[in-house]
Amino acid sequence: MRVRIALLGLSGVGKSTLIGRLRQSVQIVHLQASALIKAEQAYRAQDADSSEALRIGAVMDNQDLIIAAYRREAQATALPIIFDGHNVIDGRDGLVEIPAYVFRALDLDAICYLSADPEWIAERRQMDASRARPVRDAVTLAEHQRIAYSAAERIAEEIGCRFVVIADDKVDQLIELVG
C-alpha cells in the first residue's frame, strides 16, 4: 500500500529541510505544492507563475492545479508520497485557508503539522533570500501558526485521516509514518 502524507506548516518552518533529512533514510516522492502548480501550468501550456505570484494570486484556482498535478504524479509511482504544502496561505488580503476538499482529493493517510518557535521561523525567513515572503514578526507568526495548526487538525478530522504534530524537526516521526 502506498503511503500518502501531507506535511504542512508555515512558510519557513523547515518542511523542505525535514523532507530532505527523511530522504536520507527512506526512498520517497517529495511533491511541493508550488512545483505542482508550475508543472500543471506547463502541462496546460500556461505561463508559469513565480512563487510570489502564486502566493498573492488566485489561491483557490491554484488548488485545482495542485490536485491535477498531484494525481498525475501519484499514478506514476509506488513509492510513499510526501506532499509539502500549506493549509493556510499568507496572501495579499490576509490569511486564506485551503478547504478540506483539496486534501481529500490527495487521498491522504495522514496530515502532519510541523511547528517551531516563531522567533526561529522569523529568523529563517529573513535569512532565506531565495524566496519572497511577507515580513512577519514572531507574535504574528505565532498567531498564524496557531490558526494553521487548528485548521490542519480540523481538516484531518473532516477527511478522516490521522493527524500528527511534528515539533523540533523530528524526522523519526516521519520515518515511522512512511514505514
Question: What is each residue range found by the language model?
Answer:
Residues M127-Q173:
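Small-molecule kinase domains that catalyze NTP-dependent phosphoryl transfer to phosphate-bearing small molecules
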Residues G14:
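Conserved glycine(s) of the Walker
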Residues G85-D128:
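ATP-dependent NMP and nucleoside kinases share a basic, alpha-helical "lid"
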Residues Q24-L31:
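Post-Walker A helix-loop "phosphate-sensing" segment adjacent to the P-loop in P-loop NTPases
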Residues L18:
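Hydrophobic positions on the alpha1 helix immediately C-terminal to the Walker A/P-loop
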Residues A33-V96:
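ATP-dependent small-molecule kinase phosphotransfer cores
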Residues L7:
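Hydrophobic anchor at the beta1->P-loop junction of P-loop NTPases
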Residues L10:
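P-loop (Walker A) phosphate-binding loop of NTP-binding proteins
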